[in-house]
Design a protein with these regions (language model features):
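Short, surface-exposed loop/helix-turn segments at secondary-structure junctions
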Residues: 16-27, 121-136
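Beta-rich nucleic-acid/ligand-interaction surfaces
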Residues: 6, 78, 117-121
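Flexible, small-/acidic-enriched active-site or ligand-binding loops
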Residues: 134-174
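Conserved PLP cofactor-binding pocket of PLP-dependent enzymes
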Residues: 103-127
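Active-site-adjacent "lid/gating" segments in soluble enzymes
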Residues: 1-53
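Aromatic-enriched alpha-helical interface/lid elements that frame and gate functional surfaces
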Residues: 32, 36-109
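Short, acidic/polar N-cap/turn motifs at the starts of alpha helices
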Residues: 38-40, 131, 148
Length: 174
């Protein structure tokens, strides 16, 4: 099932669970929301910033950009206190404001794109991620779902149609 593939993204939590019998809870590990340096923060306009300034040089730049009080930059506060402070700062400005600021700052931080923004992003367009089509009817063809499969296993760029409802029943319902 699709769920089986999700475990790949939980490598950190699975490693800790299997090796030390320490099973993760929500936001309790460094790479799962337990650190202010690797987290997701909500903006004033209810969008989100993906923040990953793990290395000190990126963290220091991030703190400078958001104007985080010096007492929160070091180890004088707990991670939870720093997360709460960063959350309160990020919520004061819109995603548009933060997007402009973080495009200029090298600190591993970006506004989380909407699905519409993501499919229109140059990164995906230049790689033809949505170029394959599925024929819906004589007039309509829609982009097929991209699959994480090596290009060598994909068919050429031909528009294919999907089976009509019930068309494959005899084949698969024996």
């Amino acid at each position: 099932s699709m769920t089986d593939g999700l475990f790949t993204f939980m490598f950190w939590a699975l490693g800790k669970g299997f090796s030390k019998n320490e099973w993760s809870q929500n936001s309790d590990y460094y790479l799962s929301g337990g650190s202010p340096r690797y987290n997701i923060y909500e903006t004033k306009d209810k969008r989100y910033l993906a923040v990953a300034p793990i290395e000190d040089r990126f963290w220091n730049k991030f703190c400078e950009v958001i104007d985080l009080d010096i007492t929160y930059k070091g180890q004088k506060k707990t991670d939870q206190e720093i997360i709460e402070k960063v959350t309160s700062i990020i919520k004061t400005k819109t995603s548009g404001y933060w997007d402009k600021v973080f495009q200029k700052a090298d600190c591993c931080c970006t506004v989380v794109k909407s699905l519409k923004e993501a499919v229109g992003d140059d990164h995906f367009i230049s790689r033809n991620l949505f170029s394959k089509k599925v024929k819906i009817n004589d007039e309509t063809a829609l982009p097929s779902l991209p699959l994480p499969i090596s290009k060598q296993f994909l068919s050429p760029k031909i528009i294919k149609s999907f089976p009509k409802l019930g068309e494959q029943n005899k084949t698969y319902m024996k």
